Amino acid sequence: PKPRVGLLSIGEEEGKGNHLVKEATPLFKGSKLNYFGNVEGKEVIGGKVDVAVTDGFVGNVMLKTSEAVAKLIVDKIKSAIKNGGPLALIGGALVKPALNQIKKLLDPSEEGAAPLLGVNGLVFIGHGRSDAFAIKNAVRVAKNAVDANVLDAIKSAIEESLKK
């Protein structure tokens, strides 16, 4: 299946967005990509698209905001369980394994780094607050990308998608 590609913007309507978004829209529409159109942040998180294209600044703001919201939700659940009385504590004990799975899924140190696309090379960026576990995982992710020849695969896929 072809991944659904969206362009992160301030609204779904084609005319919305900054200069970069407006300039990118016809390039995506003219490609062989499965272009969904403009998407807002809620649609990225909600799964309407598989790939959200954005510039580094906006993408970083969205990423860090998403991480903060995830942490806030986890903290609120913990607080509600801790302060909710005996039944809440029992319920918390029952859901703890599931919550730990979700926490691990949302933990950026599990991957350690994300690829910076748009450069002619493999570049991975980690959090400035990465610990040894995150850095170890970042090296693992980067090594896997080198072993899988990801850069050439991305270049080939982009070249093919731009042919019409």
Show which residues each predicted segment covers.
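Glycine-rich phosphate/diphosphate-binding loop of Rossmann-like nucleotide-binding domains
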Residues: 1-41, 50, 55
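Glycine-rich phosphate/nucleotide-binding loop
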Residues: 51-52, 56-164
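Glycine-rich oxoanion-binding loops at beta->alpha junctions
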Residues: 38-46, 110-111
